[in-house]
Amino acid sequence: MTHTATEPGTSLPLRHRSIAIGAGSLAVLLGALDTYVVVSVITDIMTSVGIALNNIQQVTPIVTGYLLGYIAAMPLLGQASDRFGRRLILQLALAGFAIGSVITALSTDLTMLVSGRVIQGVASGALLPVTLALGADLWSQRNRATVLGGIGAAQELGSVLGPLYGVLCVWLFGSWTAIFWVNVPLAIIAIVLVQFSVPAHQHDPDRPKVDVVGGALLAVALGLLVVGLYSPDPKVSALPEWALPVLSGSGVAFLAFILWESRAKTRLIKPEGVRFGPFFAALAASLAAGAALMVTLVNIELLGQGVLQMDKADAVFLLSRFLVALPIGAVIGGWLATRFGDRIIAVIGMLIAAFGYYLISGWPVDVLAAVHNFGFFTLPRLDTDLVVAGIGLGLVIGPLSSAALRVVPAAQHGIASALVVVARMTGMLIGMAALGGWGIHRFYQNFDALAAKEPKPTGKPNLLELQQQLLNRSITAYSEMYSEMFAITAVVCVIAAVIAIFVGSHRKSGHEAQ
């Protein structure tokens, strides 16, 4: 059965389509900035709400609450855009984002602050998938990978600029609350741009209804998964003591979701016209890419502090090599996929990322002094390896989104885009919770093993020597831990490359006109 696009977008002039996708990308960038903006001002926020600086774990919900709201709302809002139109959902999401920003800026305690961040996350959960769906509506499938890669680049640019944006706002206005007050006029401007650029919704009685029950069950399953994988004391265990019941609850919720979807009349994705094999392959590869991304975001900074003995600012700057490479890779990947196909670029991108992580896993303790010697020239090892990994992960953003959208009918672009992003974000959360907890647990194991191998001191101990010995042991334990973590990440990327072989191709798709 062949489906044709039901949106009027592909008949619009290129200039009008470009303005529309530019407005959507601006909304995506705004949401992405706020995902990472708190990183650079977290200590200011802690002081403002009365949390001691040595209790930083108490403000974890500021970040995780945003991400969980983002993920939980995304499937429902993506499907709502299929039902009610891209313009309306984008505008409602931007309005919700502004409201959440106001609540966050007015916060006087942690509860109010987290509530505002959750509202922001829920609202932001619509911006990326709905804009991706808009790109799929406005461009034929053979040409859309470039557009989707550009949207992905806007998302990744937020990760680069977010911390800098936070510092700039504090420097200009003198308070961290300015970050969120500035969001209000920016959101209003974006709402106006969307109103005048995004095509109006064409009423279609055959459009799918919103599966509220299915979306809620999926949100519960994902939320419990993250809670079950997060260890508050990784020194004792890589998993928390409540892991078994909570993960079991996640499994039950996911099973209930599957049962509901198999019997319900209204589903998140109607099976008619969907090629589930390539679609699930794109989701699985996106999940793996998300896990690799989060392992890098978390652990390069920690490596800088634990192994290279940098302060926080210098350690964060280390990550800039990777973060700058991501959006560049996203733009290049979309352009290449338009010419050579999504499958081949997705596979190559994951293999390049795997090679980058393989190189990172071999970093010596003095990696800042290490170089790659190519005979006629040398390249700094740390910079080069991070750029390789970043380019590789960036390359797959557009092709995986395009491949997933190609194998579903146009009427379900919103929910399909949402599930691709959900898969990626779920991978990020799993990477942060599971590999992060496991990694710190491995640090303490390595630390204790090194201590057991050291000869017992004889005579009166020298305090300075003991301090230096302890420092050297910590650096070695951290280095061994990160080598293991990035080696595992390389394997994950290779597995993702194999999975990407099974995503859709131009030749086998027939859902839309070319």
From Swiss-Prot:
Region described as Beta-hairpin: spans on this chain: 371-380
Conditions for induction: Part of the lrpG-mfs (MAB_2807) operon.
TM helices/strands, residue ranges: 19-39, 58-78, 88-108, 118-138, 157-177, 178-198, 210-230, 239-259, 278-298, 316-336, 344-364, 385-405, 420-440, 485-505
Effect caused by changing D82N: Does not complement a deletion of this operon for antibiotic resistance in situ or in M.smegmatis
Site entry: Forms salt bridge with Arg-426, probably closes bottom of cavity: E156
GO biological process, one term: lipid transport
Keyword Nucleotidyltransferase belongs to the record: no
InterPro entries xrefs: MFS, MFS_dom, MFS_trans_sf, Sugar_transporter_CS
Subcellular location: Cell inner membrane
Cross-referenced Gene3D superfamilies: MFS general substrate transporter like domains
Site annotation Forms salt bridge with Gln-157, probably closes bottom of cavity: residues: R424
Pfam families (alphabetical): MFS_1
One cellular-component annotation, GO: plasma membrane
Residues carrying the site annotation Protonation/deprotonation site: D34
GO MF, one annotated term: transmembrane transporter activity
Disruption phenotype: A double lprG-mfs deletion strain is more sensitive to the antibiotics tetracyline, vancomycin, rifabutin, clofazimine, novobiocin and ofloxacin.
Domain of life (superkingdom): Bacteria
Bilayer disposition of the protein: Multi-pass membrane protein
Note: Bacterial LAM blocks host cell phagosome-lysosome fusion and is one way in which Mycobacteria evade the host immune system. Triacylglycerides accumulate in lipid droplets in the cytoplasm of M.tuberculosis stationary phase and dormant bacteria, and are used as an energy source during starvation.
The family this protein is said to belong to: Belongs to the major facilitator superfamily. P55 (TC 2.A.1.3.34) family.
UniProt protein name: Triacylglyceride transporter MAB_2807
Source organism per UniProt: Mycobacteroides abscessus (strain ATCC 19977 / DSM 44196 / CCUG 20993 / CIP 104536 / JCM 13569 / NCTC 13031 / TMC 1543 / L948)
Gene assigned in the entry: mfs
